[in-house]
Structures are given as structure tokens and as C-alpha cells.
UniProtKB/Swiss-Prot annotation:
The keyword Calcium does not apply. GO terms for biological process: translation. PROSITE patterns: RIBOSOMAL_S9 (PS00360). It comes from the Bacteria. Keywords: Ribonucleoprotein, Ribosomal protein. GO terms for molecular function: RNA binding; structural constituent of ribosome. The lineage of its organism: Bacteria, Pseudomonadati, Pseudomonadota, Betaproteobacteria, Rhodocyclales. Pfam families: Ribosomal_S9. GO terms for cellular component: cytosolic small ribosomal subunit. This is Small ribosomal subunit protein uS9.
């Protein structure tokens, strides 16, 4: 008998996470490493676990994640979004609870491009009147 996985894709900034969940003992593996090893900062680990803690499913699923692109913060957000979508795929009843917490909505904020003639996206060169 094949093990059935529930799948969710999460995105944040330029990071993309592919998340597979199956009933298990609560192991979270990101790119072949345990979550505590992959995310060096405590905030990253906390962000990843938020949907599970909120729905009371911490320790009930084995989660396998492939994440590419972006930095540590963007990847943590992408994994959270992916776990949220995978949980909804597992049980649609969780959707309203997750939406109320703001985990279902994709954070659309992206880095603004640098403009010609400016130092950064909006920072201009210092102007001297005299």
C-alpha cells in the first residue's frame, strides 16, 4: 500500500517551497536536514511551526520540504505557506482557522527594482541647494 502525501506549494519573496505531509511523528525535514539544523535562527523555526501549532497538529505529521531561492526569512515564510496549503489539502475544515491567522494569503511584497539615476530603489543622491 502506497503512503499518501498531501502537497502544498508555498512562496514568499523569491523563495519557493514544495511541501509534502503525511501522518507521522512530527519530523520536519527541509532540504534533507532537520528543521532545527536548516534554520539557524529561532524565528525561522517558529515561523515554520506556526500553522501546526495553531491547528493543534504539532507532532502529528511528518513533513518533507524542498525549498529554493531567496534568503533565510523568505524561505521560512515559503515553508509556512506551503505547510498551510498542505494542511488545507489534508483537511479543508482547517482553512477558516488558518485564513483568520493570515497564513493562507500569499504575501505579495517583492523587492522594488533599482531605478536609473538613483542610488537604490528610491534613495536619491544628496542634493545641495548652494
Amino acid at each position: 500500500m502506497a503512503v499518501t502525501y498531501n502537497y502544498g506549494t508555498g512562496r514568499r519573496k523569491t523563495a519557493v517551497a514544495r511541501v509534502f505531509i503525511k501522518p507521522g511523528s512530527g519530523n520536519i525535514v527541509v532540504n534533507g536536514k532537520p528543521v532545527d539544523e536548516f534554520f539557524s535562527r529561532e524565528t525561522g523555526r517558529m515561523i515554520v511551526r506556526q500553522p501546526l501549532v495553531l491547528t493543534g497538529n504539532e507532532g502529528r505529521f511528518d513533513i518533507m520540504v524542498n525549498v529554493t531561492g531567496g534568503g533565510e526569512s523568505g524561505q521560512a515564510g515559503a515553508v509556512r505557506h506551503g505547510i498551510t496549503r498542505a494542511l488545507i489539502d489534508y483537511s479543508a475544515e482547517l482553512k477558516s482557522e488558518l485564513r483568520a491567522a493570515g497564513f493562507v494569503t500569499r504575501d505579495a511584497r517583492e523587492v522594488e527594482r533599482k531605478k536609473v539615476g538613483l542610488r537604490k530603489a528610491r534613495r536619491a543622491k544628496q542634493f545641495s541647494k548652494r
